[in-house]
């Protein structure tokens, strides 16, 4: 059966859609914009069903849903649009299950690919050195330098930096206890410069910290510093130190990852340091250029080296 978008759908496909649209209007309270999106996506999918010769929604299985998602990807559909398509389909099938017209939701296990977020450009080593040339005696300046040294020296997330307590820091061994995503604990080493400046900060921290405050880094009020304050202070130091790039905590972490991977070519070690559960996250996060990839290959692959100087 061949149809066009203007071909009327059989009642067995159209009537359930109309009942669902009424359900969205009267009971779900969705906005008109969302209702229009759902209707557009479901009408398109109904046309696909008709083109395949299917006459009832109960004939849809997970394979068809995956095929539909794959078709959208091949046609260049945005991840957000594909997510809307699958979401509308899941909601519709849940509605049919509620009415006893289907026994299972074939769209339940199918998900849209995650929308790729552009990674920030990392700082080069000279920019990092320029940023960290902070040599002021003011306790807040010492704190800020210690924060930046620790973030770049250990590759911390912003939330991890803020959550560090004094008891988590082992200056003698240069080791830090970190609570990462999902409350997963890891221990990471940190640089000699971070050790030096965290030590300096600990010597003046008592001038600011409220009695009994466990946080390593505190605000002028004496309590744990906020995420926003860290972001603001780092951006200000970037301007004060005349660094061309905008400075953010994530950019320092990204720079740590990139510089570590460029110098070591050890993806697994960098994964552990960053606290990534999957190594694929590390591969995306630390964008090696082809030169570094080729260098890593030449050094590691047993058949990459030429024999007898050839």
Swiss-Prot record:
Chief subcellular location: cytoplasm
GO BP term (any one): cell division
Location relative to the cell: Cytoplasm
Keywords of this entry: Cell cycle, Cell division, Chromosome partition, Cytoplasm, DNA integration, DNA recombination, DNA-binding
Entry's Gene Ontology cellular component terms: cytoplasm
Similarity comment text for this entry: Belongs to the 'phage' integrase family. XerC subfamily.
Quaternary data: Forms a cyclic heterotetrameric complex composed of two molecules of XerC and two molecules of XerD.
PANTHER family: PHAGE INTEGRASE-RELATED, TYROSINE RECOMBINASE XERC
Protein's recorded name: Tyrosine recombinase XerC
